[in-house]
């Protein structure tokens, strides 16, 4: 998108902060003074805008997105091209099968990126506190809340992956033991509950100004997610808020509080379900009223940065599509033919009455015809790839030559273990191997629009981390789990009817088509909600946590080893490089930071 948040580094202010916030009292950065600079709200905006820099690494395959997507049932990354592409020393095989260890690349990168993001937030909070008197009370409170809430999101990502983390609210080295999951959860909830009521409430007048920034909707959505997953994080009503004051808003069960937070978002009137599902993933999607928090993208090469292996650009469509898509669409960046769906995952789109198929049938699209329903978020009913008349959420079928609807792209420059060079490219659902797959194996996620003009190297589509649709489904699930309220309080909303109708937009009566395919939501079970969340939020970084919440994470396709099924696998191991740098306890002579129990002998 063209509209950008100010991420510019306020170099002068941060230079003054140095390695310790105490240096701020000792340095005078010429004329004007720091006090003068902090009295100008534009400078405060520039300073605070830096907190969003690290979140731009979230959706990379070597970052948080890759870690949580390839370990859930929705995603897979397999070596192709004779094992020459996407091998990476067996890294993806370990992720696919839940046999990872503490030296995994993305495991290390996620730790470093999120910790650095949280530390920067603490540094900026320190500056705001030191120069509080230079700002009006309103300006100080507004930006302090914005930074504290964003810090909570960085720590949430870290917490979601590792459980035990070095949570701190001060700009200083963390010297104590890692906090236990229930204590981290309590701190996150307390911070968000404190700030949420005072955050900006989005409306049409201020939507553009608050786009890509933390808002009240952001805070309550993250709170709802924390409450919904509290038990999955190991929290009970008896072990939370032991070391931090319980928020006055907290009352009843975790699910009661999830409902309350969802209602705060719903009743704000800030957000609206888009009538077109694919508009949320369009090239220019910044006007989506469904977006609660987004990573603001710039598909051009400026502002391009690498954090070790991780890039701050959206590349998901390029990671998944076959090599031939680059030539068909004329994209600037190569398409890398890596990520795909686990075949069994796509059964959530199975048509009613569809015949039972064998795993061999996954490799024959003619046998797959009629297997999937008309839900546009799925593979669809055509299975003709680039010759499809409609847009479908998962790509299955042929890859045509550019400018042709009949001639197929030929795999001339790559090696396939069973298909000779020059084989016509037809993508199928099946995956033949986790160590040396066919180039055509696996359905590819197709919902993010790709630039077909040769203008943008990377995705110009903004990445919506939180969507309003998630809030509606979280409330329904929380109610089914015993939270206050009724399912009908959601299903009678006009936005909810729009949500289910758009999934079957190609049908004459979309809302009825949804009910015919999946039943009446008012009669759904929790398993029905899980399936729908898979359909709605594929590859949007929610599925792993959903599966953990449902106690199904370690029973997905390709996870078969006894070690992979251990309960500890709901967390990733703390990176080896982190433990190596741990401070030493002077009394015991042992490292203060220790590995998560169950991973000690990696």
Residue ranges and their predicted role:
Residues 157-160, 166, 203, 229-238, ...:
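Short coil/turn linking the two alpha-helices of tandem helical-hairpin repeats
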Residues 5, 15-42, 188, 224, ...:
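Bacterial Sec-dependent N-terminal signal peptides
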Residues 104, 108, 365-499:
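C-terminal substrate/ligand-recognition segments
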Residues 22-91, 193-194, 213-417, 555-557:
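An aromatic- and glycine-enriched ligand-binding surface/loop that stacks and positions planar moieties
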Residues 40-59, 63, 83-162, 172-186, ...:
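Conserved, well-structured interaction surfaces
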Residues 20-21, 114-117, 280-341, 455-465, ...:
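Long, intrinsically disordered, low-complexity segments
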């Amino acid at each position: 998108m063209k509209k950008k948040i100010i991420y510019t580094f306020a170099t002068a202010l941060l230079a003054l902060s140095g390695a310790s916030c105490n240096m701020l009292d000792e340095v005078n950065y010429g004329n004007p003074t720091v006090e003068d600079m902090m009295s100008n709200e534009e400078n405060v905006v520039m300073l605070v805008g830096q907190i969003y820099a690290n979140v731009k690494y979230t959706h990379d395959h070597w970052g948080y997105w890759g870690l949580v997507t390839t370990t859930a049932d929705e995603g897979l990354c397999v070596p192709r091209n004779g094992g020459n592409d996407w091998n990476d020393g067996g890294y993806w095989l370990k992720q696919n099968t839940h046999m990872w260890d503490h030296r995994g690349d993305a495991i290390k990168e996620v730790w470093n990126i999120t910790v650095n993001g949280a530390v920067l937030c603490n540094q900026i909070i320190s500056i705001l506190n030191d120069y509080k008197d230079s700002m009006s009370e309103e300006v100080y409170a507004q930006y302090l809340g914005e930074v504290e809430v964003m810090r909570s999101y960085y720590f949430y990502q870290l917490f979601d992956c590792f459980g035990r983390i070095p949570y701190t609210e001060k700009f200083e080295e963390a010297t104590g033991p890692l906090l236990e999951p229930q204590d981290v959860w309590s701190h996150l909830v307390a911070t968000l509950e404190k700030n949420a009521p005072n955050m900006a409430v989005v409306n049409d007048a201020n939507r553009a100004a608050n786009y890509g920034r933390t808002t009240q909707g952001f805070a309550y959505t993250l709170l709802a997610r924390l409450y919904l997953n509290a038990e999955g994080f190991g929290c009970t009503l008896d072990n939370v808020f032991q070391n931090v004051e319980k928020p006055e808003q907290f009352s009843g069960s975790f699910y009661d509080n999830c409902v309350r937070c969802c209602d705060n978002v719903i009743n704000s009137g800030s957000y609206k379900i888009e009538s077109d599902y694919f508009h949320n993933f369009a090239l220019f999607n910044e006007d989506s009223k469904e977006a609660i928090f987004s990573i603001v993208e710039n598909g051009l090469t400026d502002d391009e940065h690498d954090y070790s292996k991780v890039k701050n650009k959206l590349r998901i469509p390029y990671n998944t599509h076959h090599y031939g898509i680059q030539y068909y669409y004329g994209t600037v960046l190569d398409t890398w033919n890596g990520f795909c769906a686990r075949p069994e995952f796509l059964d959530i789109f199975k048509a009613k009455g569809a015949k039972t198929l064998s795993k061999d049938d996954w490799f024959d699209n003619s046998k797959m015809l009629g297997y999937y329903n008309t839900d546009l978020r799925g593979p669809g009913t055509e299975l003709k790839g680039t010759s499809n008349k409609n847009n479908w959420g998962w790509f299955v079928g042929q890859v045509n030559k550019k400018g042709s609807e009949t001639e197929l792209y030929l795999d001339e420059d790559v090696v396939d273990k069973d298909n000779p060079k020059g084989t016509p490219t037809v993508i199928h659902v099946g995956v033949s191997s986790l160590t040396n797959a066919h180039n055509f194996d696996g359905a590819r996620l197709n919902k993010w629009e790709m630039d077909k003009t040769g203008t943008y190297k990377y995705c110009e589509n903004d990445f919506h981390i939180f969507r309003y649709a998630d809030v509606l489904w979280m409330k329904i699930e929380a109610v089914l789990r015993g939270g206050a309220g009724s399912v009908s309080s959601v299903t009678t909303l006009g936005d909810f009817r729009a949500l289910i109708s758009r999934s079957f937009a190609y049908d004459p009566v979309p809302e009825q088509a949804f009910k015919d395919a999946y039943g009446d939501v008012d009669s759904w079970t929790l398993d029905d909600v899980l399936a729908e969340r898979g359909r709605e939020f594929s590859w949007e970084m929610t599925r792993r946590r959903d599966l953990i919440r449902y106690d199904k994470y370690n029973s997905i396709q390709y996870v078969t080893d006894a070690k992979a099924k251990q309960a500890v696998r709901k967390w990733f191991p703390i990176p080896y490089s982190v433990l190596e740098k741990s401070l030493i306890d002077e009394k015991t002579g042992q490292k203060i930071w220790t590995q998560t129990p169950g991973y000690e002998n990696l």
